[in-house]
């Protein structure tokens, strides 16, 4: 069935449609703090979850790394939704070359919109002039849905919005890289390289914009060998909007134990505090992000991240615990 021109034109501007629907859900006139396409969630713990946004980060440790995160949206508002992410990765060697593989799943719900993504990841790690250079690729399967039956619209026959649940899927690609030299780390990735258009039912479609992610961090040693100060920053942009996060955290590590805390600031968006550490072999971190505009400080979002590393024996004896170069 051919697409109707008015519907196609309106949904081609899906960012504006999504914003309007969210404003209906989160009270008319109140500004939402979600940014970019719904498919790209801005996690507060970007520095701890690099495999979530950069496939080159998989396989940095000989251990099996398992991570999970839950993020709530706009506390106190009905149908504000939440995001769940889970991922696992590991390293392996082929001759004298180092590689990494991983898999992850993302489930994001907000208002009438639902996004799911399943991804397989591969990375190649190469020593280079006293540093480590890595390149990664990620195959994504996207599933999008809009439940128009939940929309409270004045005009029920508005062709811009579906009247029932519609869904669709598409294949996508992500590429990434990182450069690590001693205390300095630079990372970059590009999401939605395939620029897919997801068909929702017979009369609607959802184009997906590409998103560029750039991150950096530097470990500052102090007079105490156990305490480290770590400034980091990240830029996310879909070339029509952007978000910058600037983070400062302090970290205390002793043997296999870790305690950290810090502050994050996203100009014109939010301020956040987080704290975490190692509990019974599991790394756990909690953060609260409060909006400095729009919804206000009280309607922020909570975020919890868990991580566990399981030693593997892939033909080599790994008797010593390995400290990952991941953004800890």
Labelled PLM ranges:
Residues 38-328:
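Subset of outer-membrane beta-barrel
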Residues 31-37:
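Sec/Tat signal peptide C-region and signal peptidase I cleavage site
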Residues 18-31:
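Bacterial N-terminal signal peptides
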Residues 1-15:
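N-terminal secretory signal peptides that target proteins for export/translocation
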Residues 1-2, 25, 186:
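Generic secretory/membrane-interface signal
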Residues 6-9, 33, 325:
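Residue-level detector of intrinsically disordered/flexible regions characterized by low predicted structural confidence
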